[in-house]
From Swiss-Prot:
SUPFAM superfamilies registered for this protein in UniProt: Ribosomal proteins S24e, L23 and L15e (SSF54189)
Record's keyword annotation contains Ribosomal protein: yes
Coiled coil: none
InterPro entries, per database record: Nucleotide-bd_a/b_plait_sf, Ribosomal_uL23, Ribosomal_uL23-like, Ribosomal_uL23/eL15/eS24_sf, Ribosomal_uL23_CS
Pfam families named among the record's database cross-references: Ribosomal_L23
GO molecular function, a single term: rRNA binding
This protein's name: Large ribosomal subunit protein uL23
Keyword annotations from UniProtKB, A to Z: Ribonucleoprotein, Ribosomal protein, RNA-binding, rRNA-binding
GO CC term (a single one): cytosolic large ribosomal subunit
UniProt function note: Binds to 23S rRNA. One of the proteins that surrounds the polypeptide exit tunnel on the outside of the ribosome.
Gene: rpl23
Family: Belongs to the universal ribosomal protein uL23 family.
Amino acid sequence: MIQMALATEKALKLIESYNTLTLIVDKSDTKDDIKKSVERLFNVKVVKVNVVITPQGYKKAYVKLAPEYKASDIAHKLGIF
C-alpha cells in the first residue's frame, strides 16, 4: 500500500498548483488499489491516479484529488507542508 509521501520541490509544487499528492507505493499496487486506499485513509475523493516506476526501482503515484478537497490539508496532516 502507501509507503510514504514525497516532500520534494516538485511534489510541493504539484500540491499547490494541481491539488495532487505524490506518494511512494508498493510495486504490486494497481491504480485502483491506490485510489481506494487514499480515499479510505484520508476520506477524500480521488479524480485520477498516474503511476511511474522510477529508475531507482520504486513506484511513485501522482494522486489528483477532487476540487472540493485540498491536497495541502492532507499534506499538512502528513507533516509535509
